[in-house]
Amino acid sequence: MNAERLTRLLEPVVSQVGLELDRVDVVPAGRRRLVRVTIDGDGPDGHGPSLDEISEATAEISHCLDDSGAMGESPYTLEVSSRGVSTPLTQPRHYRRNIGHLVRFTLNPAEEQKSGETFDGRIAEAGEEVVTLEVEAENSKPHKPVYTTREVQLADVAKAVVQVELNRRDAQASKEEN
């Protein structure tokens, strides 16, 4: 069975456990097939599904595939995961779930340019068409940064990827206050 048909089969199953089906891939792996299912959801903290939710979804997906016979008689391996931090943000809900996170944006190039502007910004607000960012101002100094807001149309975004932060700025600010 191809990924498109599996997507139609699995969407209601994933929805029943309160999550969203993000992607389904079927990849040959020797004599077996690898069925990769990527799920998403708000989770208990609003930032993605918990391990318990992923575990519950995995069990339901496995039962559905076995009961429906969708994979036929040939063996397969099921792999269910959340989107992961390096997966580009593509939907308005992805931006909403990453409010407060630092994201590297690459904008679509203007007509006369070969590549678009690339910059980092912390998501402050996210709507269906626009994301509001907190970005470092041009007159900012390395040891005492100054921030300003910037609105970006989602239609203008070529790529947006969450950046891993080992020392978040808001965590440092709260330490300095104490």
Swiss-Prot record:
Show the Pfam families listed in the entry. Answer: DUF150_C, RimP_N
Keywords from UniProt, A to Z, are: Cytoplasm, Ribosome biogenesis
**Where does this protein come from, organism-wise?**
Cutibacterium acnes (strain DSM 16379 / KPA171202)
The record's listing under HAMAP family reads:
RimP
Q: Which SUPFAM superfamilies match?
A: YhbC-like, N-terminal domain
Q: Which residues cross the membrane?
A: none
Highest taxon in the source lineage? Bacteria
* Family designation: Belongs to the RimP family.
What is this protein called in UniProt?
A: Ribosome maturation factor RimP
Location in the cell reads:
Cytoplasm
| Gene Ontology BP terms | ribosomal small subunit assembly; translation
Matching entries from InterPro entries are given as: Ribosome_maturation_RimP, RimP_C, RimP_N, RimP_N_sf
The protein's job, in short, is: Required for maturation of 30S ribosomal subunits.
This protein's GO CC annotations: cytosol
